[in-house]
């Protein structure tokens, strides 16, 4: 299979780099890459949001802040490259063609953000579409897709399996609420729907059982075309 992994920045760097988790995740990804072609996109997480918040105090524009966030995603990507060692393409990949070329070299391409206005969720979905991937695995600090934001509503229910069009409806509704961060951003959800790529949304615990995850055995959400 060809698999794209979308790894949230807050999963790797909750407050500071989680060395134990990054080490174990690097091992899992390395082993998976022995039997499958994989590509990885890493987000900025809490660190990126903190930098962007500080930049806002200097009245910087949104595009400037997007570029700042992109730099943080690439720093996080470099940490994962270090953990993957010789299996990784040696530098952060900046575009989809470069990712494809890295795969042809039997290396694991690791990306951060690419362009202002695109979250790393959207980059992951676009990369999966570009590579004609068989599977997109989203690793986040929420263990699946819920009917509402579980951090805001403790009565929110996890959805074990859903259609991509229903994902679009849920994240679009939640994204319209002030202060709410959705598990997958609306643009990424729309790309997942149009591309028809099977997608799994999993939490940090399942991330260390990737052989089970790619077989569909996990506690997250399965999103079908």
UniProtKB/Swiss-Prot annotation:
GO terms for molecular function: ATP binding; UMP kinase activity. One of its GO terms (cellular component) is cytoplasm. UMP binds at residues 44, 66, 114-120. It is an enzyme of class 2 (transferase). It comes from the Archaea. Its main location: cytoplasm. InterPro entries: AceGlu_kinase-like_sf, Asp/Glu/Uridylate_kinase, Uridylate_kinase, Uridylate_kinase_arch/spir. Inhibited by UTP. The keyword Nucleotide-binding applies. Pathway: Pyrimidine metabolism; CTP biosynthesis via de novo pathway; UDP from UMP (UMPK route): step 1/1. It is found in: Cytoplasm. ATP binds at residues 9-10, 45, 49, 140-141, 146, 149. Its EC number is 2.7.4.22. Belongs to the UMP kinase family. Catalyzes the reversible phosphorylation of UMP to UDP. Homohexamer. This is Uridylate kinase. It comes from Pyrococcus horikoshii (strain ATCC 700860 / DSM 12428 / JCM 9974 / NBRC 100139 / OT-3).
């Amino acid at each position: 299979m060809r698999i794209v992994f979308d790894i949230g920045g807050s999963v790797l760097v909750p407050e500071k780099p989680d060395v134990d988790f990054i080490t174990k995740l690097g091992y899992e990804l390395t082993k998976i890459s022995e039997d499958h072609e994989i590509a990885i996109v890493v987000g900025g997480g809490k660190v990126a949001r903190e930098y962007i918040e500080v930049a806002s105090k200097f009245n910087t524009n949104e595009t400037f802040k997007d570029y700042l966030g992109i730099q943080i995603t690439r720093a996080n990507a470099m940490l994962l490259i270090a953990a993957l060692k010789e299996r990784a393409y040696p530098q952060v990949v900046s575009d989809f063609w470069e990712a494809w070329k890295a795969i042809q070299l039997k290396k694991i391409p690791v990306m951060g953000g690419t362009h202002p206005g695109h979250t790393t969720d959207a980059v992951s979905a676009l990369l999966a579409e570009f590579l004609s991937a068989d599977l997109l695995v989203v690793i986040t600090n929420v263990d699946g897709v819920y009917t509402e934001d579980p951090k805001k509503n403790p009565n929110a229910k996890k959805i074990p399996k859903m259609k991509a069009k229903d994902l679009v409806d849920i994240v679009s509704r939640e994204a319209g609420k002030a202060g709410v961060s959705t598990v997958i951003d609306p643009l990424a959800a729309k790309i997942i729907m149009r591309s028809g790529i099977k997608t799994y949304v999993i939490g940090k615990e399942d991330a260390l059982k990737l052989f089970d995850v790619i077989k569909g055995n996990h506690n997250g959400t399965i999103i079908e075309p």
